[in-house]
Structure formats: C-alpha cells, structure tokens
C-alpha cells in the first residue's frame, strides 16, 4: 500500500500495450477502415493515442507507466518475408502443397490460402505478440498490463465497408481453454504457469473494476459472445474469459479491453476526430471524444480498485 498522503497508484508499474501496429501496417493487419476518400481510422493508431493519454493520467496518479510500443511500428524484428517457410508448412498441413505466392486479385478462401497471407498473419499475430511478451516479461516487468484495443463488427469488403448498428463493450481475462488448444504442449505450459503465478487472483477483480469504469464512462452495453471460445467471468456482464496469445504469454495480470464498434456510424465519426477534451459538434449534436471516454473509464476503474485494495 502507498504511504498516507501519496497518490493511489504510487509504486505501481503499469504497462500499456496499444493493440495492433497501425501506421503503414494497418491495411495488412485488416485494421484500416474508410467510408470515403480522404478519411480513415486505424485501430493501431487509435490505440496508441489512447495509450499516450493514459500514460499521462496514470503517471499523475503516481504510477510508473511504460508503453510496450511507442510508435506505429512492429516490436518484432521479423518481417513476413522471414516467415515463408513456416507459412508453407501451415498450408501443407491444410493439404495445400503448391500455394500461390501472392494474394493480389484474390479474396476469401483463395486469399487465405496464399503464402503471402499466411506469412503476414504469422508476422502480426504471432511473431509480434511474442516480441511484445519478451519486452513485457524481460524488460518492463510490470505489475499489470492493459491491452488497449477497439472492437468491430464484420464490415464486408475493405473497399466497400458497411456500417453496423451494434456498439458494445467487453473486457477479457485469460481462460476458457479448449480441448484442441490444450493438445499443444506450449499452451498447456503457459496455462499452468499462469495458474501457479496466481495472476487470476488480481486479474479477475481488476477486470471487473475496469469494466465498471468503462461502462460508466462510455455508456456501452455488454457484448454477448455466442461462440464457445469465451465464457463470462468475474461475475460481471462485461467480462469474459478467453484464451488469447497476449493474455496467456504476459507473466502478470492482464486486462484486455475491447470497447466500441469502429464501424458503428456514430462511433466512426467520433473516432475520425481523434482525441479532444470537452465536446464538439458531430452529427448535429455536441459529443465527447470516444478516446477520452475510453481513458476516463480506465482511470476510473483502476482508481476504484486500488483505493479499495491499497489502503495505507
């Protein structure tokens, strides 16, 4: 606990992990969204903006705050071209022995069955997360990681995306391992390591507190999973357990945030404007910044949790 008179987050080390990469990599990651020429949002860039806002706010409350990535660039030193052999092996296991090199002009299954697509996915979904885990576990060594993301519903073809009427919020903790996942030795090891580290003892109540703060700040309803890869957790409608690479590899409590639907029309308009304080006129009415509400919700939730659990 902090000494009397010190800020509530004093002596805590918090790592902020802005999801995805953004920048020139956003189209490859399929995290680039534009409904008309001259405007676009990229999840990796929005997550980085949110992380920078949170870094300042949490530091003001006494925390030592470190960003896992500070630029719209990969943490991993590998690139898709370095992963072609692994991509070929994946396709071979799928029964595709002579895959196309490039996905230019292809879509759907034909695109995903190319060496280029598989190598790119290994780059940004696997190699990048392992590199971040190395940075978190070996260099930063935080008390808590906040993985900052924004959600989306299916928007169809990238060149002609569709708006969704849905807008929602959920928070993820590690769990809900499937039998197929547990057939893999590395997954079993990483699961048992988290159990023995007892990360869940803090992760669950932290996630519930952050979920409450986010729900209050954003006004978003809880997302409801209809697939078996997630289940409700922490006695909170907004919190689900799910086995993701990041929340499995990071060796500390991990709160993984998924607020907003980026292709919800009003949310998209708010996100186009980025971060601001106060209110601005959007769609004929004064509105707050979605990213400011995001940051406010995280701060509100963390403050509530640590005020309760770190009494001097």
Roles of regions detected by a PLM:
Residues 2-135, 154, 158, 164-168, ...:
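Active-site histidine-acidic residue metal-binding/catalytic motifs
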Residues 11-13, 60-65, 139-145, 251-255:
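Loop/turn elements at helix/coil->beta-strand transitions in domains of secreted/extracellular proteins
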Residues 17, 147-151, 258:
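Short beta-strand segments
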Residues 20, 149, 249:
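Histidine-centered active-site/metal-ligand motif
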Residues 42, 46-49, 53, 127-131, ...:
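Extracytoplasmic/secreted proteins, especially bacterial periplasmic and envelope-associated proteins
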Residues 52-63, 137-141, 150, 211-220, ...:
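Sec-exported extracytoplasmic/periplasmic mature domains
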Residues 129-142, 160-164, 244-249, 254:
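Mature extracellular/periplasmic domains of secretome proteins
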Residues 155, 172-179, 184-201, 207, ...:
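Active-site-adjacent mobile loop/cap segments within catalytic or ligand-binding domains
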């Amino acid at each position: 606990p902090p000494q009397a008179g010190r800020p509530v987050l004093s002596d805590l080390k918090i790592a902020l992990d802005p999801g995805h990469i953004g920048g020139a990599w956003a189209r490859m990651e399929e995290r680039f969204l534009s409904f008309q020429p001259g405007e676009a949002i990229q999840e990796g860039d929005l997550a980085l903006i949110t992380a920078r806002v949170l870094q300042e706010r949490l530091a003001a409350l006494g925390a030592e705050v470190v960003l896992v990535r500070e630029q719209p660039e990969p943490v991993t030193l590998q690139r898709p071209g370095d992963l072609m052999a692994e991509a070929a092996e994946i396709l071979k296991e799928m029964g595709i022995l002579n895959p196309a090199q490039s996905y230019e002009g292809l879509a759907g299954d034909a695109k995903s069955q190319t060496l280029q697509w598989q190598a790119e996915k290994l780059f940004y979904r696997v190699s990048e997360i392992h590199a971040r885990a190395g940075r978190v576990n070996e260099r930063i060594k935080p008390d808590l990681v906040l993985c900052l993301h924004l959600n989306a519903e299916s928007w169809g073809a990238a060149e002609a995306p569709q708006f969704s009427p849905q807008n929602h919020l959920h928070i993820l903790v590690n769990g809900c391992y499937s039998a197929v996942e547990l057939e893999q030795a590395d997954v079993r090891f990483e699961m048992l390591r988290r159990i023995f580290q007892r990360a869940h003892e803090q992760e669950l109540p932290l996630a519930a507190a952050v979920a409450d703060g986010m729900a209050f700040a954003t006004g978003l309803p809880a997302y409801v999973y209809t697939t078996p890869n997630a289940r409700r957790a922490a006695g909170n409608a907004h919190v689900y357990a799910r086995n993701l690479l990041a929340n499995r590899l990071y060796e500390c409590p991990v709160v993984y945030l998924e607020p907003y639907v980026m292709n919800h029309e009003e949310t998209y308009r708010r996100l186009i404007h980025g971060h601001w304080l106060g209110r601005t006129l959007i769609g004929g009415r004064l509105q707050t910044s979605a990213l400011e509400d995001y940051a406010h919700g995280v701060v509100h939730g963390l403050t509530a949790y640590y005020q309760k659990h770190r009494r001097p």
